[in-house]
Amino acid sequence: MRSNGCGDLRKEHIDNSVQLCGWVDRRRDHGGVIFIDLRDRTGTVQITVDPDLGAEAFAVAEHLRSETVLQISGKVRARPAESLNEKLATGAVEVLASGITVLNSVKGNLPFPVSVHDEENTREELRLRHRYLDLRRKRMNDNLRLRAQTIQAARRFLEDEGFIEVETPVLTRSTPEGARDYVLPSRVCGGEWFALPQSPQLFKQLLMVGGIERYYQVARCFRDEDLRADRQPEFTQLDIEMSFMDQEEILQLNESLICSIWKAVKGIDLPRPFPRMTWHDAMERYGTDRPDTRYGMELTNVSDIVKDMGFKVFSGAVKNGGAVKCIAVPGGNEALSNVRIKPGGDVFSEAQKAGAGGLAFIRVRDGGEIDTIGAIKDNLSDEQKQELLSRTGAEPGTLLLFGAGDTATVNKALDRVRQYLAKELGMVKADRDNDQWNFLWVVDFPMFEFNSDENRYEALHHPFCAPNAEDLGSDASQWADTLPGARAQAYDLVLNGLELGGGSLRIHDSALQRQVLQTVGLPLEEAQEQFGFLMDALDVGAPPHGGLAFGVDRMVMLLAGEESIRDTIAFPKTQQARCLMTNAPGGVADKQLEELHVASTWVDPTEEDSN
């Protein structure tokens, strides 16, 4: 049907007869001559329709609408000097049309414009409802091509390193670790259920036991959890596992993988090695285990300086086992008014959203003088003031913002405020303009975290991470005193404040695996019922192994400079886990439920209220 792509035509094609297919991007009538911008996946080219040289083609062109599908026959010629378009790859040529065939027309009005010339801030809900049309937009088309490039580059690298792609089951069984499962009833095995995998975690470990040694998969994963901009109920992981490699070797190989992807997709040579930071240092300095290191404003712990001062908000927080931390905002005196920091202000609101009661502040003036509320100023000695300024490195013009309370809340609040101010004050570029790629390995994660509501320990990542041998010995009866500080051989790769991927060395000894499962509250009988197949596998000569998984959707979001992963997925769900285009999820016939031995107990709240 076509001889060339619209965006492929160049000066070397002048005088060639061509056939093109595509959509009408724009149509312009310039008093007797009609110009059509014809668009396909390769780009856009100008079509000139002259009634003196093609009367039938002109008659068709007079009535064309945007997004009409055309086949055009014509000859490539040079554009007149006055109409050259340097913004287009095809801007030096045009096609003089001799024939136009309408392959399909547009019925009714388009829900939103597609042409790059007419792009507007269309509501996302409307875009998702008509996703097939939204995908024609250059931005979306480019994102999907970039996604394909990213996966292709990863496959090429891994296969060159001796990895093989193996598919693992999508229908599996529900296990108690991780987030909530999506479950599916079995028709054949009445009363029993499959679960969709949250990750291929156990299967890839079994592949290592099976001697595969180097595995990867572009895996579909499913989690029934509350959603946000960078999460979806179904998502894609680049899943990797390998045997006979220690943590250092795994980190090195995956740095090489990331560098290979960035080179292939962005043409960038990333500096190596990537910096590393322990989980403890990340939490202390940034308040988060995924710090954005493109800018400063690190958290400074000043608990020891203010623990005895008369300002009870500070001293009380330390007395109750919490912390007082602050961030130093350079130029903050001029950039941030008191109104923005106090209740009702935008900066105050950011802290409040993270659970903080508010923010205290100190403005550093010329000569090291400070300006703050009386309750702080009156209770801060000269020695404490000088120590604060020294520890924070605050120069005149700096604004110090303080959080006080339990350490977790202080960290969360100041982390949120820090990220907010970095954007507000121009310390980082907008996503689409970003040219900083600050990678960071976060290592030495805690093995466990304590769940105070259930009065038990839980695995911070998952219960298959190998513990650091220095922290947990082989005798589980001696673990009680070391659990709070026990580290896992786990690692995350962070990019510009977002987790790009994470993994660990795995437990490959069945006795240790049972001990860890018991520690996180899974009795031996239940552990055997849920994970007996894994224990059996570990008992037949399981090799030392480890790996990690990268979030493909998030990786592509960062490479594309998008704010949401929904703009890097062909057919995403909303934050309510709905597909607006197909209206999924939807109801099913009673007969289907009967065949599955399932009865619905759902009651529509609107109907219940009306009764």
Swiss-Prot record:
SUPFAM superfamilies: Class II aaRS and biotin synthetases, GAD domain-like, Nucleic acid-binding proteins. It holds the Pfam family GAD. Its EC number is 6.1.1.23. Signal peptide: none annotated. One of its GO terms (cellular component) is cytoplasm. GO terms for molecular function: aspartate-tRNA ligase activity; aspartate-tRNA(Asn) ligase activity; ATP binding; nucleic acid binding. ATP binds at residues 223-225, 232, 499, 551-554. Keywords: Aminoacyl-tRNA synthetase, ATP-binding, Cytoplasm, Ligase, Nucleotide-binding, Protein biosynthesis. The keyword Secreted does not apply. The record marks 30 as: Important for tRNA non-discrimination. It is found in: Cytoplasm. Residues 201-204 are annotated as: Aspartate. It is an enzyme of class 6 (ligase). It catalyses: tRNA(Asx) + L-aspartate + ATP = L-aspartyl-tRNA(Asx) + AMP + diphosphate. L-aspartate binds at residues 177, 223, 461, 506. GO terms for biological process: aspartyl-tRNA aminoacylation. The keyword Calcium does not apply. Homodimer. PANTHER family: ASPARTATE--TRNA LIGASE, MITOCHONDRIAL, ASPARTYL/LYSYL-TRNA SYNTHETASE. Aspartyl-tRNA synthetase with relaxed tRNA specificity since it is able to aspartylate not only its cognate tRNA(Asp) but also tRNA(Asn). Reaction proceeds in two steps: L-aspartate is first activated by ATP to form Asp-AMP and then transferred to the acceptor end of tRNA(Asp/Asn). Belongs to the class-II aminoacyl-tRNA synthetase family. Type 1 subfamily. This is Aspartate--tRNA(Asp/Asn) ligase.
